[in-house]
């Protein structure tokens, strides 16, 4: 049955009620009710987020001790950096989250040793509170040597080595293109004994970074042509490593 639109006075009353109930979100509901879309396609295409991030997470097939989980963190960070290189991105911040297994509290021996904070997972089971930390890099980079080193330092600093680990999440924050990072001006405090010119050490560092970038691109080229397991590192063959197995999966399932 057709109904006439409410009067202007009634519309105002309804709008006031909506804003009282839903706050600023009421504006979206009102626009939707009238079939009005304030955002144009041009605005959607022109949108650029203030911050970007790239990351990966892994739920381990069984509880891992801290030393084995460290190998997985190294593998994940290595792969994350390769993904950045592939898309021409760099980062200056790494965030690491490590989730512990319920066995830390269900096993009487382990539970007796643990005196830290306890929380619950999404299934309502008690687990030790996860470890979480951030590592800031000196500048934007996609150097695996730099990023992996900082991530492992962060891992060693935040985890409890006595607990079993089940989940690992590694995220690269403040991600931007290499061109955007180069445009940004950086400043460094200098003393009277510093020289403005590039030192031999700085030149050597630049050359080392360039060589590493060339090696990373060569690795990507080989992987894209012959498969992800065509070129691996010694770390990937250590006990507890998961990269070789994960490379054969699609969406986390065996291909």
Model-predicted regions and their roles:
Residues 2-164:
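DNA-contacting surface of Y-family translesion DNA polymerases
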Residues 124-255:
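Acidic, metal-coordinating catalytic segment for phosphate/diphosphate chemistry
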């Amino acid at each position: 049955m057709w109904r006439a639109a409410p009067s202007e006075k009634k519309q105002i009353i309804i709008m006031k009620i909506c804003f009282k109930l839903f706050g600023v979100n009421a504006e979206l509901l009102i626009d939707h009710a009238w079939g009005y879309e304030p955002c144009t396609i041009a605005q959607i295409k022109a949108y650029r987020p203030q911050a970007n991030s790239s990351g990966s997470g892994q739920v381990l097939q069984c509880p891992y001790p801290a030393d084995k989980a460290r190998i997985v963190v190294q593998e994940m960070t290595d792969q994350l950096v390769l993904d950045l290189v592939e898309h021409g991105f760099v980062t200056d911040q790494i965030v690491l989250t490590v989730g512990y297994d319920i066995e830390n509290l269900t096993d009487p021996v382990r539970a007796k040793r643990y005196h830290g904070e306890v929380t619950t997972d999404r299934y309502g089971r008690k687990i030790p509170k996860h470890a979480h930390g951030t590592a800031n890099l000196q500048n934007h980079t996609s150097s695996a040597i730099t990023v992996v080193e900082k991530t492992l330092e962060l891992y060693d600093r935040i985890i409890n080595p006595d607990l079993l680990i089940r989940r690992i999440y590694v995220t690269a924050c403040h991600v931007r293109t290499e061109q955007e990072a180069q445009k940004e001006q950086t400043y460094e405090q200098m003393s009277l004994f510093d020289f403005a010119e590039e030192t031999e050490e700085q030149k050597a560092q630049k050359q080392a970074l360039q060589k590493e970038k060339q090696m990373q691109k060569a690795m990507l080229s080989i992987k894209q042509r012959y498969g992800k397991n065509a070129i691996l590192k010694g770390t990937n063959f250590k006990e507890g490593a998961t990269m070789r197995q994960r490379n054969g999966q699609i969406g986390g399932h065996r291909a």
